[in-house]
Amino acid sequence: KRTALASLGAALFLSNMVHAQSLEPHAQQLKAQQAQQPKLSVELPVQGVTLNYTQPVRLEQVLNDANANGALGYFPLSAQLFDRNAQPQVDNLKAQVIEQLNQLALQKPQARSVITQLESFDYQARYFVDLDRNAVISQPEKNPLLVSKSSALELEQSNQAQRFDLYLTPRPIDVTVVGAVKQTHKLTLIEHGQLDNYLSKLPKGELLEIADRSAAFVIQPDGHVDEISYAYWNSKQAYFAPGAIVFIAFDSLPSEFSALNQNIIELLRHKVNL
């Protein structure tokens, strides 16, 4: 009886060994496949190219590879990098802004034109970083490791690839006017032009009654925001980069909408400028 039990135990041991050995190649193969999967994916929509990396790399490497894939001669100030893993954050911001505008439109129906304007644009989660290749090469602090800023993405515990979109475009030739106007306008860039020069190009009566007629905001292509006073008693010089957005803000908003102008500005900083 003892001999039979010993034989059975030995058989089970050998069976487990064979099973473990048969699983080992599969585990190694799976591990190898995971190692080969891209940990970082950067899409260049303008060039129709996707750059894949098996590990995170620095911005300089991506810009060098982009140049090698047809992105030579892009305009650095209007270049945009978007963090696709963080997209829900911008989607939530857009939903919040549209809801605020819908509520405002119950009191001020003219606000509906702003809803139409904002909904016509594409927004992605902007990864704000200097995309001037010369600056990235010469200044180490401008050459970060590309890592998603999404709070929901636990990189150490997730196999999810980090995904970015990099828009590298030629120098824009226009400036976009949005906000408290009847509709969006793309105006030809005026060298050394000031806000009055652009507003004079709009059709007569284009500004809404609820528009702020003393100040506006300029969202530069790199995401920097400048407030510009343009009333005759407090006007000041301003710079409009090629591809800038001029936001005509609302004036004298009810207290419950006190943050609306700033929320719209923040949303427009994430607009895909194509």
Residue ranges and their predicted role:
Residues 20-274:
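Ser/Thr/Pro/Gly-biased, low-complexity, turn-/loop-rich segments
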Residues 1-6:
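Bacterial N-terminal signal peptides that target proteins for export
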Residues 7-15:
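Bacterial N-terminal signal peptides
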